[in-house]
Structure formats: structure tokens, C-alpha cells
UniProtKB/Swiss-Prot annotation:
Residues that coordinate or bind Zn(2+): 20, 23, 39, 42
Keyword Chaperone recorded: no
Subunit structure: Part of the 30S ribosomal subunit.
Pfam families, alphabetized: Ribosomal_S27e
Zn finger region (C4-type): 20-42
Cofactors: Zn(2+)
Any GO BP annotation: translation
Protein name as annotated: Small ribosomal subunit protein eS27
GO molecular function: structural constituent of ribosome; zinc ion binding
Length: 65
């Protein structure tokens, strides 16, 4: 009997480093937010919640592990 490779599955959510399109501010956000995430400098919406993965409205620079 073969054992599964991953006994403990890894989460599908990630932290993302994004760049605001309006002001260029870099900020770290969660990929599955429960509330709307806004830019700390200009207040533009970066990520909107959808019940699962959020709609990312900023440029993704890096996916953090």
C-alpha cells in the first residue's frame, strides 16, 4: 500500500508583496483577505475579498514563502 507524499498538506494561501499602481508604494498583503486591503499611503484599493482568493488590483512583485 503506497503512502501519500504529503501527509500534511501545505496551505494554498500566500503573502504577496504588491506595488500600488497609483503611488508606487510597496506593501505586503495576504492572498485571501477577509476585508478590503487599502494602500497605506494613498488609500487606493489593493485587494478585494471574494470569499476565497482575493481580487488583486495591484502589481504583484513577489510571492513570499
Amino acid at each position: 500500500m503506497a503512502l501519500p507524499k504529503n501527509l500534511i498538506p501545505m496551505p494554498r494561501s500566500r503573502f504577496l508583496r504588491v506595488k500600488c499602481i497609483d503611488c508606487g508604494n510597496e506593501q505586503i498583503v495576504f492572498s485571501n483577505p477577509a476585508t478590503t486591503v487599502r494602500c497605506l499611503v494613498c488609500g487606493a484599493t489593493l485587494v478585494e475579498p471574494t470569499g476565497g482568493k482575493g481580487v488583486i488590483k495591484a502589481k504583484i512583485l513577489e510571492v513570499l514563502e
